[in-house]
Amino acid sequence: RDAQESRGLGDVYKRQTYNPAWRKGKEAFFATDGSDQSMIVMFAPEGCVINGVDSELYDWEKKLPRIEDLTDGMPPALQKLMGSREVKKMKSTFCVWTEDGITWYCNPMDGEDASKDLLPLIDGDPQTYVEYGKWFYPADLPLEAVRQLADGVPVTKELVAALNPKRSEWEEIKTGLDKIGYPNEL
């Protein structure tokens, strides 16, 4: 279920999806700008891998970076994540990974790779997300409401109304939040 829809932004704004049961013992977060840039963040007990692509950066048949080059030096357990059907379908123009959540690794490629556009979206700063939202939502997202979501504050009807006053499908929103394990008081 779409995490953003569950947070009250509506079907038309689906850009991000979180799946806490993506694979056995693994979670995934998917993000897209709706056109040429996409990212998948894969969480496993062995670490985390972020794969991203900008489909307009390369001639897909000739110059796309090879997965082997992007994952050179990556631990085998994390390399398996890069073999998922989602990554194969999406392709890759950048890949970063960590085993401990502190030190991140990448194999930089020549030229643009979309990382400067996509990685800031998951920097943990609510202001970054509010700025990102200006490109996609008809009204500015309220910083305080976004901050509450980032802090894990339980979703209430008041919080949903702050994000989108037109949403009132409480059971649908609650079901979506329950599915991804996000706390709520709906």
Predicted regions and their residues:
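Aromatic- and glycine-enriched beta-alpha-beta binding-site module
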Residues: 28-92
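Intrinsically disordered, low-complexity regions enriched in Ser/Pro/Gly/Gln/His and often acidic
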Residues: 15, 22-23, 90, 97, ...
